[in-house]
């Protein structure tokens, strides 16, 4: 929302799918362990997605949703899926706070286990996401009180052991849990590497113990922690913290950590850190793509997180400093953050997905991969209301007809199909695409995207059409949501405070 029947496997696509983030000799995992699936946030599935024609089961992700008029301004945590098809669901339990994590059978939705967490939200405008992560397919890591992380074993079993870890030392937390709970909070989804180390942004409030300042934390598999303040990581005393909801990303070899930071006014940097030490390796000031003398903005009301491409390039969505109908920009950098490349024409609350180029059969360019992004043109911010999804070529350019800026070339776009009666002065206006990270299936050459008309669509990247759809709800304006693909090909989407498991039906 603007701020204001299975397919046959395709052999070529299989090869493409495996090459995005996995060595050719490795059998790709079938799970969906975190936000954007992997630590690079590619959102590329390794199983064949089912056609979205039928709701198999559903479950609430909010037991007390609070509506602002007809809108729902809550970012719900991404569902996760284990290799054995347990779906992990983050549930908001109270009107203003309170959370629990559920494990449900992917085939039936039956509840397997419930794990409470003492995590409490920070002060906020839109409700930020709470994002657990599966580490090494064996344990579930959950945000807890006071900047701690809860580690639950055996995520596919009804029972599992739970231990708490603190990046500043569990003995310190145990000595004064109330003070830490009041002054230190995890404020981003958790990101785990292949060794089981976990990374996240945290925010401090008031006078936190141990001299803790808002920044970036790392916990090893054994629970040993380290941290760096946002100020020190950026080398800029004006910097405050990591934006709420912005999950750190890792390079393909896991050695580099990418994270955004901002000052109180919302301007800031994208940083690259050593993932072992959190030492600074580089930074880039985030600038407006139309006027690079002005700073772009980062919002606590979004979930934009860095995406790392198969070649190591880094993409990050920001808000604009110059008018472009509140679309923002998808900024593009090399792995060292020393070279600024052609931006995409949309960045607000969006984490781009990676699309292997041959999945788009009409594409005739030279890039090995493309980007999938939201591409709304908000009628409420001066746009036409022709809200689209887009496949972009990050290495080709065009002139943006909205802003006049040089942006990534559009390869394929599709407009929402449902007219938007809220904008009678814009006769072409359609309901917004409601997605912050979209599941991509190279095996069927498809992407799965939510819309504020209450439907989940399969975008066929061969025909360019919205080939399949299923009604989830009557539709609502809401904070953007993720889609994922489970190990059996079930599609999962959130709409109006409910998680839906979708397939082709009986």
Locate predicted features:
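Bacterial N-terminal signal peptides
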Residues: 10-19
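C-terminal region of N-terminal signal peptides and the immediate post-cleavage residues
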Residues: 18-29, 41
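Bacterial N-terminal signal peptides that target proteins for export
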Residues: 1-10
């Amino acid at each position: 929302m603007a701020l204001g029947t299975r397919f046959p496997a395709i052999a070529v696509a299989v090869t493409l799918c495996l090459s995005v983030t996995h060595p050719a000799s490795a059998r790709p995992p079938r799970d969906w362990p975190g936000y954007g699936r992997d630590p690079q946030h590619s959102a590329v599935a390794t199983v064949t997605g089912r056609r979205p024609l039928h709701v198999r089961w559903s479950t609430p992700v909010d037991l007390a949703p609070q509506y602002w008029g007809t809108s729902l301004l809550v970012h719900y945590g991404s569902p996760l899926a284990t290799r054995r098809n347990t779906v992990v669901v983050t549930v908001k339990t109270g009107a203003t706070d309170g959370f629990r994590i559920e494990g449900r059978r992917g085939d039936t939705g039956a509840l397997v286990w419930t794990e409470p967490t003492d995590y409490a939200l920070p002060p906020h405008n839109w409700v930020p996401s709470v994002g657990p992560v599966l580490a090494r397919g064996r344990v579930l890591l959950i945000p807890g009180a006071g900047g701690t992380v809860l580690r639950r074993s055996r995520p596919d079993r009804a029972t599992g052991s739970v231990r708490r870890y603190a990046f500043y030392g569990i003995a310190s937390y145990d000595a004064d849990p109330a003070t830490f709970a009041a002054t230190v909070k995890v404020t981003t989804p958790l990101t785990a590497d292949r060794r089981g180390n976990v990374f996240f942004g945290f925010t401090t409030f008031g006078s936190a113990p141990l001299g803790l300042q808002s920044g970036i934390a790392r916990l090893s598999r054994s629970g040993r922690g380290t941290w760096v303040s946002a100020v020190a990581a950026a080398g800029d005393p004006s910097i405050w913290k990591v934006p709420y909801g912005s999950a750190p990303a890792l390079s393909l070899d896991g050695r580099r950590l990418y994270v955004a930071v901002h000052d109180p006014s919302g301007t800031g940097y994208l940083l690259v850190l050593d993932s072992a030490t959190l030492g600074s390796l580089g930074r880039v000031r985030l600038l407006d793509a139309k006027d690079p003398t002005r700073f772009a903005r980062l919002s606590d009301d979004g979930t934009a997180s860095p995406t790392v491409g198969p070649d190591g390039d880094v993409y990050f969505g920001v808000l604009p400093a110059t008018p472009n109908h509140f679309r923002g920009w998808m900024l593009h950098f090399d792995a060292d953050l020393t070279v600024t490349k052609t931006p995409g024409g949309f960045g607000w609350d969006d984490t781009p997905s990676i699309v292997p180029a041959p999945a788009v059969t009409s594409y005739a360019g030279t890039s090995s991969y493309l980007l999938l992004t939201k591409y709304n043109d908000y009628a409420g911010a001066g746009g036409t209301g022709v809200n689209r999804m887009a496949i972009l070529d990050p290495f080709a350019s065009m002139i943006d007809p909205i802003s006049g800026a040089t942006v990534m070339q559009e390869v394929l776009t599709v407009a929402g199909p449902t007219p938007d009666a809220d904008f009678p002065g814009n006769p072409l206006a359609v309901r917004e695409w409601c997605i912050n990270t979209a599941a991509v299936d190279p095996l069927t050459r498809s992407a799965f995207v939510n819309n504020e008309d209450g439907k989940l669509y399969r975008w066929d990247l061969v025909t360019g059409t919205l080939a399949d759809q299923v009604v989830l709800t009557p539709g609502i304006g809401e904070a953007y949501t993720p889609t994922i693909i489970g190990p059996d090909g079930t599609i999962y989407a959130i709409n109006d405070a409910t998680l839906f498991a979708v397939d082709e039906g009986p």
